[in-house]
Amino acid sequence: MITPAPFPIGRPRRLRRDSFTRNLVRENTLTAHDFIYPVFVVEGQGQRVAVPSMPGVERLSLDLLLPVAQACVELEIPVMALFPVIDPSLKTYDGVEALNPDGLIPRVVRALKKEFPQLGIMTDVALDPFTSHGQDGLPDTRPENEGYILNDETTAILVQQALTQARAGVDIVAPSDMMDGRIGAIRQALEAEKLVHTRIMAYSAKYASAFYGPFRDAVGSASNLGKGNKKVYQMDPGNSDEALREVAMDIAEGADMVMVKPGMPYLDVVRRVKDQFKVPTFAYQVSGEYAMLMAAAQNGWLDREGVMLESLLAFKRAGADGVLTYFALDAARALRKA
């Protein structure tokens, strides 16, 4: 137990007296190296489509994404995370387009790694952008199991999706689907193909959250999902012990890094995971978190830069080693001028 000196011997405000002292004793800091920048990519040329529910975020074709990648390199943001916007005509029950070696994501990965080999590229392993029903896996078609997502059958497809991405040269595959056992299956498949340097960032504690709405708008899966939900595979927001079990399983199965999603509503989970496992731990400041802060800032209710940086610092204070954030570019620029 820490016993502070009693007042007036102890005056905590001494260490808040001026900026040099505050900088000297600051316990947690932000740098651009803490950020992973999620981006939405579409087919075509010259395509720039705003996401209305995420002010400032756009879906970009590859030619317009290249300057964004250049900005990440210049700002020293280490990783860009790709999320595809798939043509509705390619969406199927089984999401087979996710396995296309010449599909959108593999082509973008190859182009980015050719132009910017020093920039880390991360890809999403899940079927929801590719399925006609908007689920991350295969729905059970038996009437008595309506609404249930098949686990092992889905995992078999996810393994092939991860291999497709790894063969294209991606640095990090990030399974976000929450199927049981998928991390081990993916790791074994990568090892079998000698893709030993492909890292896995597991969405280990991904909650069935109400904060994902704008993201589903961005990737075009909201209309496919309709009134459906993902509660039979994503975690119950009331649970935190369960998160520790999920993380433990993923580490044992071969995950290099783990993630908690969403971020700010689950900072307690971030702290528990980091304290318990001492592994690289990340949080995702999801679309709903971003949209809330942007809406308040646009209405003049909050200072945009102030809440942006404070919210990101909160992740570091809670124990996160890094943050996936749509603020990455703006935050990196703000830190440079600070």
Predicted regions: what is each one?
Residues 2-6, 18, 31-36, 42-338:
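Alpha/beta enzyme core
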